[in-house]
């Protein structure tokens, strides 16, 4: 069981490391802690935190840095959101208050505003997409091993694409696979459909298809088209500012995620639900890929009968969480107000 002072030391290590990017030593802590404590006592507290796995020692310095476990503990128990500055609040209100002719424009601009305010990569998901549910899926044979895949959603949207089916897969097998999809996935939000395509659905399809990959590709591509209409990313090049040359593989993974597959991006946002309006997930907690040196802050917003949407920030693990959580909480409220005002013109 950690003492209050040890938790204070952890909190201060995270603050100082966030600000400087440098390992934090006992002498620095002795100067920065709000209570007077000897250097020896601080070293003992740091040893206890290290034994608990909350901080770790770097090879190049005698200082300590937070571990992933330390950040998780901090986010779950210690973080205190900072009130957004008057300047940032005025910027949010002014930018969202511009004249927009389409809801898509508001959602797209929200990602750009958020990325400009934070210098991180911002992702914005419109309310209707986050609330769209699958209502049906079918394949229509066109001959010459071609089929038209048709996906229908509860907002009346119909997506269709033509695909070539491998000769090894018969249409009878495809019909059985379609029945599984409709039995298991109809009625679910598209976010959950994308998740289940990567978890339990493939094993179900194995009962009828020798290799379900071809069918999953067809369904996944149509799903991606249906789920990506109001999905916007702002500041994608900001990733290059906080990922160094040694993280080039990480950068390629993220760019591929953002540019190539909105189904994956939807799954990235759809993590485990916590009972807080703003949630933070660290690299190892992110799916479908582990983004080791990054964190994702997500916040949902409610537009009444028009559904719920989501905004998110993707940035370095050592981002200033207190500030970012406070900013995102205010931003989601202001975005919800702006979209509510927009819809009011059509609800009268």
UniProtKB/Swiss-Prot annotation:
One of its GO terms (biological process) is negative regulation of DNA-templated transcription. Keywords: Repressor, Stress response, Transcription, Transcription regulation. It comes from the Bacteria. Pfam families: HrcA, HTH_DeoR. GO terms for molecular function: DNA binding; DNA-binding transcription factor activity. InterPro entries: DeoR_HTH, GAF-like_dom_sf, HrcA, HrcA_C, WH-like_DNA-bd_sf, WH_DNA-bd_sf, WHTH_transcript_rep_HrcA_IDD. Belongs to the HrcA family. This is Heat-inducible transcription repressor HrcA. It comes from Lacticaseibacillus paracasei (strain ATCC 334 / BCRC 17002 / CCUG 31169 / CIP 107868 / KCTC 3260 / NRRL B-441) (Lactobacillus paracasei). The gene is hrcA.
